[in-house]
A protein has these predicted regions:
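SH3/SH3-like beta-barrel fold
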Residues: 33, 46-50, 58
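Active-site-adjacent mobile loop/cap segments within catalytic or ligand-binding domains
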Residues: 150-161, 171-172, 198-255
Length: 255
């Protein structure tokens, strides 16, 4: 808990890194209850002094009281993850055959995923958390500013004629930074009731203008009767949350 530029580590084995991010080397680890002195902040990481005269970087959210239920640090608990519920506000997105709006279901999914990841200790930021309009360029800008470890944009597909297409596709734009993330997520959406169509290149602004590992997931066809029955069910957001959590766990384990 931060008090007068000091904090207490609330979980065991929190990594001390050489720089402000997961890409930097692990130099040490602290035990639960360790007092640290905050010297400076960058990208939601803290440069701290601990054990008298040792220094290093620690994820700021791992010293917050709300994460005290964690028992140990993991790569997900060190990660900053931006979730992007597609559309919102005046932008309804695609429509189901009965006029249900895509924006409603992207937000439901994003909130479920956020809850799952936060329970694992991750620092999660949503580009919107209510029915509001957020411009396309503002969405990747959030990930770039935060130096996010992953950006996931949630959408639902639509075909020109209803009931003619089905499936989930995970899109990437920058192969070098994002293909591994797309593959890890795709490998886990196979557990979902809507079949996976695999990964593919996608020229979408929110991932094209994104310098961070980023994907756009089309989680089914909103104008397909069978897909929409699943999309609109109460359990689908939870199922997606479990799949995304598993995919991110695999992805971060291999970084």
């Amino acid at each position: 808990l931060a008090t007068n530029n000091t904090a207490t580590v609330n979980i065991a084995n929190v990594n001390i890194r050489s720089g402000p991010g997961m890409s930097y080397a692990i130099e040490d680890a602290t035990s639960k209850g360790t007092k640290v002195h905050i010297m400076k902040r960058k990208n939601n990481w803290l440069y701290v002094r601990y054990a008298d005269h040792k220094f290093g970087w620690i994820a700021s959210w791992l010293v917050n009281e709300h994460n005290s239920q964690l028992t140990k640090t993991t790569k997900i608990s060190e990660a900053t993850i931006v979730l992007d519920p597609g559309h919102g506000g005046s932008d309804s997105g695609a429509l189901s055959s009965k006029g249900k709006m895509e924006k409603t279901y992207t937000l439901r999914v994003a909130k479920a995923v956020a809850k799952k990841l936060r329970a694992a200790g991750a620092h999660v930021v949503l580009t919107r958390d209510s029915d509001e309009y957020v411009g396309l360029s503002a969405r990747p800008a959030i990930a770039n500013k935060l130096h996010a470890d992953a950006f996931i944009s949630f959408h639902f597909d639509s075909s020109p004629e209803k009931n003619t297409a089905s499936g989930i596709t995970t899109y990437y734009y920058h192969k070098s930074t994002s293909l591994a993330l797309a593959k890890a997520l795709n490998n886990n959406v196979s557990t979902l009731p809507i079949p996976s169509k695999g990964t593919d290149f996608g020229d979408f602004l929110v991932i094209r203008d994104n310098s961070r590992p980023s994907v756009l997931m089309e989680l089914g066809y909103i104008n397909d009767k069978s897909d929409f029955k699943t999309i609109s069910s109460k359990k689908y957001p939870q199922e997606v949350a479990h799949a995304v959590y598993a995919g991110l766990s695999t992805y971060f384990a291999n970084q």
